[in-house]
Amino acid sequence: MQIAHIGTDIIEISRIRKAIKTHNQRMLNKIFTKKEQVYCLRLIDPCPSLAARFAGKEAVAKALGTGIGKIVGWKDIEILKISKQPEVFLPERVYQKLGISKVLLSISHSREYATAMAIALI
């Protein structure tokens, strides 16, 4: 496998907290899949994990070279913690159209920021 592209993103957790407070479930349903919501909302403070996934989706979209839009939407990028590290799930059509075989992702957060780095492989 070879690296096709990389993508990074950083976001203030307070932005996600404010968006959830203002738009509540509508915002969650627009950005996050049901599985992502179930995982994050079980936490005492879900905002850091939601922000990390938001940054992850942005980083993945950048690594795919598409951004969020016509080819890849917010919920097309699903970030789940299957083992100890997050895994990226995309619709098969995205892999085929872009010639990508896999996307690796690292996400992290501190008290104020969430960050992510994605590597798209061909």
From Swiss-Prot:
Listed GO biological process terms: fatty acid biosynthetic process
Keywords: Cytoplasm, Fatty acid biosynthesis, Fatty acid metabolism, Lipid biosynthesis, Lipid metabolism, Magnesium, Metal-binding, Transferase
EC number: 2.7.8.7
Binding site for Mg(2+): 9, 58
GO MF term (any one): holo-[acyl-carrier-protein] synthase activity
Pfam family, one: ACPS
Keyword Translocase: no
Cofactors required: Mg(2+)
Main location: cytoplasm
Stretches of the chain forming a coiled coil according to its record: none
GO cellular component, one term: cytoplasm
InterPro entries linked to this entry: 4-PPantetheinyl_Trfase_dom, 4-PPantetheinyl_Trfase_dom_sf, ACPS, Ppantetheine-prot_Trfase_dom
Function comment: Transfers the 4'-phosphopantetheine moiety from coenzyme A to a Ser of acyl-carrier-protein.
UniProt protein name: Holo-[acyl-carrier-protein] synthase
Gene (UniProt): acpS
